């Protein structure tokens, strides 16, 4: 845990001279990683599930708004399922998190992002599975006619690939470990739709229950991206690794040491603080998506005979 910008975020986005030396020393490993990722994706067996599958993905590791994007577009349709890996969950294998808004498992079993999706998508079913094809098959079994695939670009499915592109890219366009990309940056050209922040969508934030002295607590990737949305009432920032569980005793200690009046958390972090007795303020993030993007997704969904306008 750090209260300033984490080491890895500096390494990938604003490296020091020493870090740049390390980056170029590791570059041969990045080339190997890139080749393996590309070969694995392009030689994988093709799956066609005969229903529209919309993959909301990104090329960089870590957060880029995939979950808020799905939260924004999935409610526009009926008979929908969301299939995700379920990062940092306590469970293994396929788990049905919710069926049409009826939540079946606790947050730790689902993972924070999948649980957040289940809480907010009342008309959708949410499924987690390391093997996404099993998740899609379960969605079909549940009667879903549209599937949103969280982070599915690397899977060789017959799907509509939408890639989110951040406003601020990593410092170097390299793959891991020298850069933050999981695929060659040229893979943007393979997407059906590239959705660029501040061009094709805008982030809109609000704070529920703001107080005079808020202690920011978050476990998201690249947490300094929140800085642009933080009010002056934030007295300190506590950063944890992405998806990390929170130590409630540590939070209580920091809360009183900083004379805080509430913890400021994101909606994603909030699902892990259901047992927290401290006052909570919530930084709500929503996306305003360009109509042309929505029209492209509509066009793909309507190309399947099982989806007519009355079902949208």
Swiss-Prot record:
> What GO cellular component entries does it have?
plasma membrane
Q: Which GO terms describe its molecular function?
A: ATP binding; tetraacyldisaccharide 4'-kinase activity
- What gene name is given for the protein in this entry? lpxK
The answer to keyword Transferase applying to this record is yes
Q: Does the keyword Lipid biosynthesis apply?
A: yes
**Name assigned to this protein:** Tetraacyldisaccharide 4'-kinase
Extract the InterPro entries matched here. LpxK
Query: Which reaction is this enzyme known to catalyze?
Result: a lipid A disaccharide + ATP = a lipid IVA + ADP + H(+)
Query: Part of which pathway?
Result: Glycolipid biosynthesis; lipid IV(A) biosynthesis; lipid IV(A) from (3R)-3-hydroxytetradecanoyl-[acyl-carrier-protein] and UDP-N-acetyl-alpha-D-glucosamine: step 6/6
Residue positions binding ATP: 60-67
Q: What does this protein do?
A: Transfers the gamma-phosphate of ATP to the 4'-position of a tetraacyldisaccharide 1-phosphate intermediate (termed DS-1-P) to form tetraacyldisaccharide 1,4'-bis-phosphate (lipid IVA).
């Amino acid at each position: 845990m750090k209260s300033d910008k984490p080491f890895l975020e500096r390494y990938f986005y604003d490296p020091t001279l020493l870090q740049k030396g390390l980056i170029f020393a590791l570059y041969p490993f990045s080339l190997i990683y890139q080749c393996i990722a590309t070969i694995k994706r392009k030689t994988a067996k093709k799956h066609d599930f005969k229903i529209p599958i919309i993959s909301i993905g990104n090329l960089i590791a870590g957060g880029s708004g995939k979950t808020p994007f799905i939260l924004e577009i999935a409610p526009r349709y009926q008979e929908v399922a969301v299939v995700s890996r379920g990062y940092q969950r306590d469970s293994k294998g396929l788990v049905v998190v919710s069926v049409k808004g009826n939540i079946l498992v606790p947050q730790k079993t689902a993972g924070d992002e999948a649980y957040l999706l289940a809480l907010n998508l009342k008309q959708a079913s949410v499924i987690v599975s390391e093997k996404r094809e099993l998740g899609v098959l379960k969605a079909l079994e549940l009667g879903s006619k549209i599937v949103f695939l969280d982070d599915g670009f690397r899977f060789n499915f017959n799907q509509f690939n939408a890639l989110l592109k951040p406003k601020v890219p990593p410092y170097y366009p390299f793959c891991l470990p020298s850069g933050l990309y999981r695929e060659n940056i040229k893979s943007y050209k393979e997407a059906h739709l590239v959705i660029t922040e501040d061009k094709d969508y805008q982030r809109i934030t609000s704070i529920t229950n703001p107080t005079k002295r808020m202690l920011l607590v978050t476990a998201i990737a690249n947490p300094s991206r929140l800085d642009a949305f933080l009010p002056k009432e934030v007295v300190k920032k506590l950063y944890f690794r992405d998806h990390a569980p929170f130590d409630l005793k540590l939070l209580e200690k920091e809360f009183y040491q900083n004379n805080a009046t509430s913890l400021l958390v994101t909606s994603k972090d909030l699902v892990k603080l259901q047992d927290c007795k401290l006052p909570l303020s919530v930084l709500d993030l929503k996306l305003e998506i360009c109509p042309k993007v929505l029209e492209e997704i509509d066009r793909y969904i309507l190309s399947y005979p099982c989806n007519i306008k009355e079902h949208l």
